[in-house]
Amino acid sequence: STIAYLFMVLATVLIAAGGYVVNDIYDIEIDAVNRPEKQIIGKHISETEAYNFYKILCVLGVLCTLVLAFLTHNLRLSMLPLTIMLILNFYAHTFKKQFFVGNFMIALSTGFVVLLPTLFEIGGKVDDSDMQLEIQSGIAIAGIVYGLFAFLSTFLRELVKDMEDVNGDI
């Protein structure tokens, strides 16, 4: 339904925004070296304010995910946005300094975010007619290809970004 799709998009946007905020919190010192002109936390808002904003984004993202689970009657698929939220938090806190692992986690999260609408679309169908199965197969293939493209392009982008930011990471 349109309402379920809206909540899926809203949950995704809120969780992604939370991921950016928590990453910027952990990157205050690195950003001061690599991108001082773009630094917001520590210059325009305090670390405490940023952390409170992060918590608000996460709570709203979780609430949207719970509404999504209720609307779709699909708790398993609704766990994916929550899993992505945890991955983004662990990345910012622990894995971002691990060259390959951190890059892989961000790319995996991006790939799943792109794949999420496909999973909801084909996961909610119960019609097993030949035409419906063919349509679902086409949607699944397109979603998987798009998700893989998002994963690979993000992974390569993260590797390049790490090479550019090496001065602030030392």
Language model segments and positions:
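Acidic (Asp/Glu-rich) catalytic motifs at the cytosolic membrane interface
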Residues: 11-41, 45-49, 153-170
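A cytosolic-side transmembrane-helix exit/cap motif
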Residues: 26-31, 99-106, 122-131, 163-167
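Small-residue-rich segments of transmembrane alpha-helices in multi-pass membrane proteins
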Residues: 41-42, 104-121
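Multi-pass membrane catalytic core of lipid/isoprenoid biosynthesis enzymes
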Residues: 9-11, 28-81
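Membrane-embedded alpha-helical segments that form the functional core of polytopic membrane enzymes
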Residues: 1-26, 61, 76-89, 134-160
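Hydrophobic residues within the alpha-helical transmembrane core of Major Facilitator Superfamily
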Residues: 89-90, 116
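Membrane-interface helix caps and helix-loop-helix hairpins in membrane proteins
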Residues: 70-72, 92-101
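C-terminal membrane-associated helical module and adjoining short loops/tails
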Residues: 55-58, 93, 111-114, 124-170
